[in-house]
């Protein structure tokens, strides 16, 4: 089968002929229709320090996808040949305390599709049936292929009550932009998103952000005054991993504010902890998606009218995968879809 593999311990990714994956009694074999390129895939492509420590070489990568079930393990129930599915990319152990308590997104033994095991940048993928999610008929393949990052946005945004609240999102990557759309859809008052990438800020405006602020050109506190905000942000969603952005968030949060953090800093990050203490802030770390509450909410949000389609800006056939990675690397894109049909 065709597959994109991290074939060498250097920058790049390679289109190869790989063996079709073998499945077990509890697995599904999925014929991939579309995949999307994630920021994690770009880390792997660029072979940065994290990738060098984490990714086995060679390995098929990728974890954002939609496909069709073409074979079913003999112990599997609830799925049929022809079902259209995406899937949870975090494979959990099932036996740790959190798994047994139903908090599988907090499994201490999580293995990542396309990170620790063979991924979805291939014509076929095998995953445990437990991890598969049936896609409703009224949700397109394009949208289904980005359910993984959309789930990060939904999990982060819905961590706290948003109705009538003022929300600050730091980092206008695709996940931050989708989070802005979610916040507006569920009833937030002002949704302000910050970045320095004007292309992505314009995407955020199209997706419903009240204000998309280029912090290299505008002062966040001036924007708050223009919006008539007299206190501070009630909810903060940190999506950038940039220390200066997080410090700006701490400066502008209201007392008693709540922060959900998805962005991963490049190293240790110093902050003024007295602001956290004296403001009584709550900080929650976010990793992945809640299984499978987030997945059901994703489908319901789209079915209730949330439009995240503008975040998809580029489509390529798999043979043109290099153009897709170049588009992602340029910073002048939203989500990039690769078609395997």
Curated annotation (Swiss-Prot):
Homotetramer. One of its GO terms (biological process) is L-threonine catabolic process to glycine. The record marks 148 as: Important for catalytic activity for the proton relay mechanism but does not participate directly in the coordination of zinc atom. It is found in: Cytoplasm. Zn(2+) 1 binds at residues 38, 63-64. NAD(+) binds at residues 175, 195, 200, 262-264, 286-287. Its main location: cytoplasm. It comes from Shewanella oneidensis (strain ATCC 700550 / JCM 31522 / CIP 106686 / LMG 19005 / NCIMB 14063 / MR-1). Binds 2 Zn(2+) ions per subunit. The keyword RNA-binding does not apply. Its EC number is 1.1.1.103. Gene3D superfamilies: Medium-chain alcohol dehydrogenases, catalytic domain, NAD(P)-binding Rossmann-like Domain. Coiled coil: none annotated. This is L-threonine 3-dehydrogenase. Zn(2+) 2 binds at residues 93, 96, 99, 107. Its cofactor is Zn(2+). Pathway: Amino-acid degradation; L-threonine degradation via oxydo-reductase pathway; glycine from L-threonine: step 1/2.
